[in-house]
Amino acid sequence: MPLRRFSPGLKAQFAFGMVFLFVQPDASAADISAQQIGGVIIPQAFSQALQDGMSVPLYIHLAGSQGRQDDQRIGSAFIWLDDGQLRIRKIQLEESEDNASVSEQTRQQLTTLANAPFNEALTIPLTDNAQLDLSLRQLLLQLVVKREALGTVLRSRSEDIGQSSVNTLSSNLSYNFGVYNNQLRNGGSNTSSYLSLNNVTALREHHVVLDGSLYGIGSGQQDSELYKAMYERDFAGHRFAGGMLDTWNLQSLGPMTAISAGKIYGLSWGNQASSTIFDSSQSATPVIAFLPAAGEVHLTRDGRLLSVQNFTMGNHEVDTRGLPYGIYDVEVEVIVNGRVISKRTQRVNKLFSRGRGVGAPLAWQIWGGSFHMDRWSENGKKTRPAKESWLAGASTSGSLSTFSWAATGYGYDNQAVGETRLTLPLGGAINVNLQNMLASDSSWSNIAGISATLPGGFSSLWVNQEKTRIGNQLRRSDADNRAIGGTLNLNSLWSKLGTFSISYNDDRRYNSHYYTADYYQSVYSGTFGSLGLRAGIQRYNNGDSSANTGKYIALDLSLPLGNWFSAGMTHQNGYTMANLSARKQFDEGTIRTVGANLSRAISGDTGDDKTLSGGAYAQFDARYASGTLNVNSAADGYINTNLTANGSVGWQGKNIAASGRTDGNAGVIFDTGLENDGQISAKINGRIFPLNGKRNYLPLSPYGRYEVELQNSKNSLDSYDIVSGRKSHLTLYPGNVAVIEPEVKQMVTVSGRIRAEDGTLLANARINNHIGRTRTDENGEFVMDVDKKYPTIDFRYSGNKTCEVALELNQARGAVWVGDVVCSGLSSWAAVTQTGEENES
């Protein structure tokens, strides 16, 4: 009769049970029905299971290591018995960030292994540095490797954010409103206003952007302008966009300085995408550590411990995100079981880089369409009419080690233009930037800049120069200017000194020069606040006009609790003024900052200017808008008043909410249902945001992953039980507005004394409410949490009889003593016969 087939689960259980029965072969004990493989007797039943095939775990083991405590599972292998020969049918590798990695050669050998037989020692050699060892006693497969066969576990420099968490239509509207009034000295005045709107409506990763402004609202000169009307999809590392936008909003990888003002109607496509996040905070040169077993890696610089990280066995790249920027050496120390295994010096190369960061793949973008060029004029000398033209171009950017570059080639109005941008750090102290433009009408431009940190770390220097010559087609002006400046930190030489900064600008085209020199020193810093000294001079000369010189000196006093005060003097326009300024900041409330300033001429000839001027301002942060109100009376006698306010509105389905924040064009609506001024907090990626009332909208940056956790607010007396919807994980694209509707119970800790209708105390009685139960003490007193939506307590007795206490908790917050309360429906406690739980529930 044929043997019964085993299911995969039964095979594994049966096999693990049989390994304990295996014995070394012995002539007197050998069973004629058993088979011997690798020195182990295989019973016939287990032999049949092997013939059917079974899966065994695959572990990586470092050659020379004692025991298997540091082995790591890296996959599984399917083994089977074929005509008395044990073989591996296939190996399935399992990727894990914490596991050791094998070299590419070893990995290829493993993945291509098929029907490979074990030798008599139950071993399959793979390379000179790796082999497979099968243990039938433990029923596991080991990949035994030397260090040379190990790969390196590198940290990912890029990651796609994945699909959107919002699968329905939603929208974010950002608004910015401003109004200003100028009151003239002769009594006249003028008022103007504007309203800018930016709307992004999205369905998953698809979104449409509308951006425009209204000007002169309420006046006879009202105007409007649409700056962008565009469809965009940025997903999985590629971006497509199509529609209308002005040249100020044109996205490009490389410089595009020769594009004149106007509107573009066209398309673009490329891999310059925000949906792929590049990590540029790691060292460009990986810091690698080898661990023969699980242990620690210590990074030390100049005797200072910078980082301690834990790793399993293998070659691992050390996380350098938290290390300081710069190029420097660190000592990498590997510690296993409390002993230093190795110590070596490696170089960290972390520099601020533009774009996608060092090591990112080549980025590219192609674009084109119809170009409406606006009318152009240069100081009234040159004038070009508005014109329609074609536009087409391509951009690309990349990096090699610390060197980064970008290039753009495009054409319009029968002109071809090429532009490049190069950035090259030289060591850790010097950074060189070059930007060039060349056009077919003989136009060219060169912008060069060098910044350097001088030895000792107490000073820095920068030099910039621009030269531009424009031919007869491009709508751009010539330029010829240079600038030089630096900062000297004298504090590093002597602690009582401060910081001195100087700059010089020379515009040779307009024959203008501008000098500045500033000095700042901290005079006092302690428990009572800080006192700083500021002094400076500016000198400006334009063409043949006489030089204009301004000077100032001021003392800045910063006090605890957000107070700031400044007093000083300035000299400009031929007279000297004394200045006073004060500012107060608030952590809570609608008004966040108030300030005022006052200036009075104390010497010199003021001419037509007033001797007294000043102003006041306030910054506010309300539920639906935030902004600034400013009133200022200038020395020329004009009184200027302006108000700015901005905010956002989020919408999805039946849910709509507004906010005074404008953090991004995506967001979350929290429909908490809290009554009145109830408050909880939302913890989003580690940041805490207050949520007040029934519904809140929180704008967030698009192309981001967010971990959202609702919790009680430390600033509220109320206590809430967040039953469901406490934690959420969101991926948001532009225009995505997620809705979180948690089940929130407002809890009040109620204490009191409960009586029957005749006044007798309910002693040692088990009482219940909507969410829990408790027991009174000998005096009928109790303490229990109550949901404010269900402010009742009941007591069940005599089987199915119930009495109930109705609590008045409308104004209660946190904890409340309700005193004596009556359980209506229970005439007397003495009349209740209590036998254990018989009269309680």
Swiss-Prot record:
Keywords per UniProt: Fimbrium biogenesis, Signal, Transport
Induction: Negatively regulated by H-NS. Positively regulated by IHF and EcpR.
Coiled coil feature spans: none
Leader peptide range in chain numbering: 1-29
Domain of life the protein comes from: Bacteria
Family stated for the protein in its record: Belongs to the EcpC/MatD family.
Function: Part of the ecpRABCDE operon, which encodes the E.coli common pilus (ECP). ECP is found in both commensal and pathogenic strains and plays a dual role in early-stage biofilm development and host cell recognition.
UniProt name for this protein: Probable outer membrane usher protein EcpC
Organism annotation: Escherichia coli O6:H1 (strain CFT073 / ATCC 700928 / UPEC)
Gene: ecpC
